Amino acid sequence: MIVDVRSYTAHPGLLPKYFADYAAGPFAVQTRHLGQPRGYYMVDTGVVNTTIHMWGYKDIAERQAKRDAMQADPEWKAWLARNAGTFVAQENRIMKAVPFWPVAGHPSGPYGLVDFRLYTVRHGKLPELLKLYETEGWGPQSKHLGNCVGYYQSDVGGQNQILHLWGYKDAADRSMRRGAMQADPAWQAYIAKAMPLLQRMETQLVVNAPFFKP
């Protein structure tokens, strides 16, 4: 399974109008071709005026076929023309699920706030980090944080990266859960081994778009 992670930054003040216009019709057109998104978010803390949406596919071939059909749809073409000029930047990356995720029986919602965490791993160290996390990190982290919305590794785009998303009720819930995790000796032992393997860590807090119900 792969996920197309798409990040669009709008001109200041235009994102609410984009969401309203998109929800009124184009969302139905897009989901008719691509299926339901795995996430459709608005950045709350991070790169503001940005929407992040994630679409799942069986493989690259399925993604191409579905997107080709969507791009040929007259309703979608009309929407693209109406929406031209809304965004100042658009980027996407293709990622694949890590071998140990999804986990059967793991909580899957509901959530109102998502911690969107992108880590860049030192060159050549990604397999080592994933193995270490699977054996020593996943247990304490999932015990304390609970709702893992997704856990992916880079495929097309930026390389040597992992993306993991954690759902929370709100900011207070996030602070409480992360505080408990960071105080756990098992997590502290994992972090001591993992930090030398990491090159860069970024996080954004995102909320669900008005029309997206996880």
Q: Where on the chain are the PLM-derived regions?
A:
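Short S/T/G/P-rich N-terminal loop/turn motif that feeds into the first structured element of a domain
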Residues: M1-P214
